[in-house]
């Protein structure tokens, strides 16, 4: 049955989805039997494939980027990794069947999903009824998806009539040729090519290499991701891993290289990409419009907006399959990959509202618009975000709407409410429970051990429609969250620090309480955290956390490349009770050195002991490697123990009784 349908699918250039819904043994047995009737690659994504089929763990499916397979099985019986599912769909060539194995149809929404451990911040798998109902609805509504339930006969959905498909013949399409002609004539510049999966981005890059008289280098998130370009390049382009390429640019001569081609550029850390671009006269960046490699429109808005100039290019016509492919359609619809058309601002009044998960998920059109707006503003969006939005506990949403259009969106996550005992363990570095990003960070790195006991909501994402930016919509969304909050101590936000972003949060009433010590890999920005107090306890936390940051800032800024003034430091370098607590946490518990930096610097000013290892690193700025050698210890773990030992010595020498008190507190489980 599948074989006859597959011949027509190949002629039409499409792929199809067959859902097998039933008990695990039945699903495996039917999948094995069906695979035996059709020659193909048949990777089995999931655990325990039947004999003769090759297991491919879901975490390894990304390795198929830029590659092609014929037919596949995706076992979603215990765990549904939608990132892996999307990646697998993108790797299947025309004429392929994808078999999706699911639990019994009616039971599925009530069953725990093992994949939820990756995104729900829960210690055990949770049920995910909103997303599963959403997926089931899309599967049932698509006329070309076949759903085969256990104890029912297999009846394939009919294939609509389509014109015959002409697979690529090695020559560029009209779209590709127009872009190639422009690139081959280029003297210099940056070009950004965005397209959906299977549109021939990598093929075009390879054709450029093959036809250009210039030396071309290729980089990408992995060598496998650039295989498509490499095949067309006929061995003329050298592949470099991004970090190795940057090292080569810094240390060697790259003046003979005429083109740098960056495949799936949105998957490469922005600061690294920014530096690479500056070394080459011509750069072609390719990135996927929507999906698991990054969001193309968000990439254009965020990364490319920071370039002096660039030219945007796009490909619309599929290459690996025909226009209107059945598998691409169901994947795009179910995972909300379709970017919504630009909305013309028409002067409609804007209404603000709150929405809880159940309410938002019950309105598919509003959900799609809400998610599309957030995706367009954050190019690191992945299908995990959709799953978290729909089913993770503690999610809350605010919307700004003009008619039916969502023009502003804010997404918040509950944090805090931990017991004092657990909060103390977080402060001491003994435990790091899932979630609670800002609340835990203020305890683990900001010195406020009690912060996780307070109740708060963290703004995880906020976005407004580009046509309506700078009209106060985002600020109004935040104000609505502040005014309608009940039983909360504060709102928080964690963001990559830039002056414009901080000005926005400051205008909303937030105050800085923490700056990370290292730039984020994805953005190159330092993580900043800020809070907006809503209660007396929240105000006390704001005051204490900001004072802690301001007091430590003179030493922190020596390690952080930010031109930022943080008022509030009174210049007092004597050891206070908060310093004793911090130092005891470092000396007698497991707090990291970076979290205790200011207190350690003040300790060195107060102590008359040599403390050679601490002074070498903190006052003379010796590297950890130099400190290891000077201290005669066996490595960085031993060096950390030595630093802790020196700190304990200094505390004991300053005030033995006080030292014992704070040692007992740091080691207690109160």
Protein language model regions, located:
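N-terminal pre-P-loop "Q-motif" helix
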Residues: 1-5, 167-187
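Conserved lysine of the Walker
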Residues: 27-28, 201
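Conserved RecA-like ASCE ATPase "motif II neighborhood" in helicase/translocase motors
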Residues: 52-87, 237-278
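N-terminal accessory nucleic-acid engagement/regulatory domains that precede
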Residues: 61-158
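Conserved coupling/interface region of RecA-like P-loop/ASCE motor cores
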Residues: 125-174, 304-343
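Conserved acetyl-CoA-binding loop-helix of GNAT-fold acetyltransferases
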Residues: 203-207, 461-484
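Terminal substrate-recognition subdomain of acyl/acetyltransferases
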Residues: 240-251, 271-272, 278-379, 417-455, ...
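Conserved beta-hairpin
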Residues: 394-412
């Amino acid at each position: 049955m599948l074989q006859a349908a597959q011949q027509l699918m190949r002629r039409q250039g499409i792929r199809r989805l067959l859902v097998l819904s039933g008990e695990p043994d039945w699903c495996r047995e039917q999948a094995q039997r069906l695979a035996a009737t059709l020659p193909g690659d048949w990777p089995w994504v999931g655990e325990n494939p039947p004999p003769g089929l090759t297991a491919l763990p879901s975490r390894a499916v990304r390795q198929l980027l830029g590659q092609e397979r014929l037919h596949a099985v995706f076992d979603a019986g215990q765990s549904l990794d939608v990132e892996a599912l999307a990646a697998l769909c993108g790797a299947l060539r025309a004429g392929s069947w994808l078999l999706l194995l699911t639990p019994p149809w009616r039971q599925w929404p009530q069953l725990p999903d093992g994949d939820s451990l990756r995104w729900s911040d829960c210690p055990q798998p949770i049920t995910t009824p909103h997303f599963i109902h959403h997926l089931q609805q899309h599967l049932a509504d698509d006329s070309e998806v076949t759903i085969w339930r256990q104890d029912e006969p297999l009846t394939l959905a009919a294939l609509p009539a389509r014109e015959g498909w002409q697979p690529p013949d090695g020559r560029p399409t009209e779209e590709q040729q127009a872009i190639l002609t422009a690139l081959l004539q280029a003297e210099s510049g940056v070009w950004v090519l965005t397209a959906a999966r299977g549109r021939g981005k990598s093929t075009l890059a390879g054709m450029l290499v093959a036809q250009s008289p210039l030396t071309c280098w290729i980089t990408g998130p992995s060598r496998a991701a650039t295989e498509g370009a490499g095949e067309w390049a006929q061995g003329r382009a050298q592949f470099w891993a991004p970090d190795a390429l940057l090292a080569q640019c810094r240390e060697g001569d790259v003046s003979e290289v005429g083109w740098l081609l960056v495949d799936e550029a949105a998957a490469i850390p922005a600061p690294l990409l920014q530096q690479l671009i500056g070394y080459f006269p011509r750069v072609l960046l390719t990135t996927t419009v929507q999906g698991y490699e990054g969001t193309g429109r968000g990439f254009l808005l965020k990364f490319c907006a920071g370039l002096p100039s660039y030219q945007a290019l796009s490909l619309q016509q599929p290459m690996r399959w025909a226009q209107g492919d059945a598998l691409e359609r169901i994947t795009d619809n179910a995972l909300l990959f379709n970017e919504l058309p630009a909305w013309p601002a028409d002067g409609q009044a804007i209404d603000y509202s709150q929405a809880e998960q159940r309410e938002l998920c019950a309105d598919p059109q509003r959900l799609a618009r809400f998610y599309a707006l957030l995706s367009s503003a954050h190019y690191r969006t992945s299908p995990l975000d959709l799953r978290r939005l729909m089913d993770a506990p503690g999610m809350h949403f605010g919307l700004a709407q003009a008619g039916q259009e969502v023009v502003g969106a804010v997404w918040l996550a509950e944090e805090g409410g931990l017991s004092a005992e657990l909060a103390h363990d977080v402060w001491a570095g003994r435990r790091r429970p899932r979630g609670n990003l800002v609340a835990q960070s203020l305890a683990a790195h900001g010195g406020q051990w009690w912060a996780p006991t307070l109740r708060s909501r963290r703004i995880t994402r906020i976005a407004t429609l580009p046509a309506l930016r700078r009209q106060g919509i985002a600020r109004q969304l935040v104000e609505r969250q502040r005014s309608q909050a009940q039983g909360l101590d504060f709102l928080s936000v964690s963001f990559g620090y830039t002056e414009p972003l901080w000005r926005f949060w400051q205008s909303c009433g937030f105050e800085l309480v923490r700056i990370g010590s290292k730039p984020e890999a994805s953005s190159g920005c330092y993580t900043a955290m800020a809070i907006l107090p809503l209660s007396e306890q929240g105000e006390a936390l704001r005051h204490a956390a900001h004072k802690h940051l301001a007091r430590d800032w003179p030493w922190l800024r020596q390690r952080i490349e930010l031109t930022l003034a943080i008022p509030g430091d009174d210049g007092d370098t004597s050891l206070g009770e908060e310093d004793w607590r911090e130092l005891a946490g470092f000396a007698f518990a497991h707090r990291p050195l970076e979290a205790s930096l200011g207190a350690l610097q003040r300790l060195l000013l107060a102590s008359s002991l040599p403390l050679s290892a601490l002074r070498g690193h903190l006052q003379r700025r010796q590297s950890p490697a130099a400190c290891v050698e000077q201290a005669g210890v066996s490595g960085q773990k031993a060096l950390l123990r030595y630093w802790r030992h020196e700190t304990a010595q200094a505390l004991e020498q300053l005030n033995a009784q006080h030292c014992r008190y704070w040692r007992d507190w740091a080691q207690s489980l109160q």
